[in-house]
Amino acid sequence: MTRLSSGGRIEVICGCMFSGKTEELIRRLNHVRLARQRLIAFTPRRDTRYRLGSLVSHNGLSVEARVIDSIRDTPAHLNTDIHVVAVDELHLLDDPPDAAREVCQDLADRGLRVIVAGLDQDFRAQPFPAMAQLMAVAEQVDKLYAICVRCGAYATRSQRLIDGKPAPADAPTIVVGGQELYEARCRACYEPAR
């Protein structure tokens, strides 16, 4: 068990679609509440799958959150009473790749615990640059796995489907959706975008 320090830190929860990233984020935030620490959570405006203004896991767990367009919007919502800052679906924010690293490092340097969740790879199995940069400087990185819908192995890839077939390589990188558009797949069952 990792003992949390009293100083600032960055924690990253990553993985493919349906790996339980938001559920794990909500679990950690519930522990923060039990410790009577004040928190603020953020969710991207682009994430329209569930309730705007809430972090919502695929199994229905939820936490109230502020809606933002950019990671740079987070400091404006903070006050001196906040101990923990949480950001869900980081890869959906409209920012240059280094913005998340800069903002999260600044918050951690100010003594805050920063917990970020998001996809580590896009549907092409390429790293999301913002997540990759943040993972490099985080004190803790937890990669979660889903179950491959094809063979039952641990899944590490998000297969985007269009009419039941893998999306082409030139499809937009960001398309918000759930089981109607994506499947969790292992390396062997993943079909590269062409």
UniProtKB/Swiss-Prot annotation:
Q: What is its EC number?
A: 2.7.1.21
Q: Which UniProt keywords apply?
A: ATP-binding, Cytoplasm, DNA synthesis, Kinase, Metal-binding, Nucleotide-binding, Transferase, Zinc
Q: Name one GO cellular component term.
A: cytosol
Q: How does it assemble?
A: Homotetramer.
Q: Does the keyword Membrane apply?
A: no
Q: What is its main location?
A: cytoplasm
The cross-references to InterPro entries, in alphabetical order and at most eight, read: P-loop_NTPase, Thymidine_kinase, Thymidine_kinase_CS
Positions of the catalytic residues = 89 (proton acceptor)
Q: Output the Gene Ontology terms for molecular function.
A: ATP binding; thymidine kinase activity; zinc ion binding
What this protein catalyses is: thymidine + ATP = dTMP + ADP + H(+)
Instruction: Tell me which Gene3D superfamilies the record gives.
Output: 3.30.60.20, P-loop containing nucleotide triphosphate hydrolases (3.40.50.300)
Q: Which PANTHER family match?
A: THYMIDINE KINASE, THYMIDINE KINASE, CYTOSOLIC
- Per UniProt, the enzyme's principal EC class comes to transferase
UniProt xrefs under HAMAP family: Thymidine_kinase
Origin: domain of life: Bacteria
Q: Could you tell me where this protein is found in the cell?
A: Cytoplasm
Protein name, please?
Answer: Thymidine kinase
- In this chain, ATP is annotated as bound at 15-22, 88-91
Task: Kindly state a single biological-process term from the GO annotations of this entry.
Answer: thymidine metabolic process
Which residues hold Zn(2+)? 148, 151, 186, 189
Protein's UniProt keywords contain Lipoprotein: no
